[in-house]
Amino acid sequence: MSKIKGNVKWFNESKGFGFITPEDGSKDVFVHFSAIQTNGFKTLAEGQRVEFEITNGAKGPSAANVIAL
């Protein structure tokens, strides 16, 4: 799987999900807190730059292996 870079569009900490806007201009990608690769509390900030992979889930594309840059 190839890594894609993008920016967090929004992330709801209480619900544990949000969306990432890929820098290549493609459609926003769903991100669940379980895909964030960090220790401790897994959250993302609006506008934060990230690197991730795209997987196809039951409800469409979603981010996997999300790493903050």
From Swiss-Prot:
One cellular-component annotation, GO: cytosol
MF annotations from Gene Ontology: nucleic acid binding; poly(A) binding; protein homodimerization activity; RNA binding; single-stranded DNA binding; transcription antitermination factor activity, RNA binding
Chief site of localization: cytoplasm
GO BP annotations, alphabetical order: negative regulation of termination of DNA-templated transcription; regulation of gene expression; transcription antitermination
Coiled-coil stretches noted in the UniProt entry, renumbered to this chain: none
Entries under CDD domains matching the protein: CSP_CDS
Keywords: Activator, Cytoplasm, DNA-binding, Transcription, Transcription regulation
Xref: SUPFAM superfamilies: Nucleic acid-binding proteins
Pfam families xrefs: CSD (PF00313)
Superkingdom assignment: Bacteria
Span of domain CSD: 6-66
Subcellular location as annotated: Cytoplasm
Cross-referenced PANTHER family: COLD SHOCK DOMAIN CONTAINING PROTEINS (PTHR11544)
Protein name as catalogued: Cold shock-like protein CspE
Source species: Escherichia coli (strain K12)
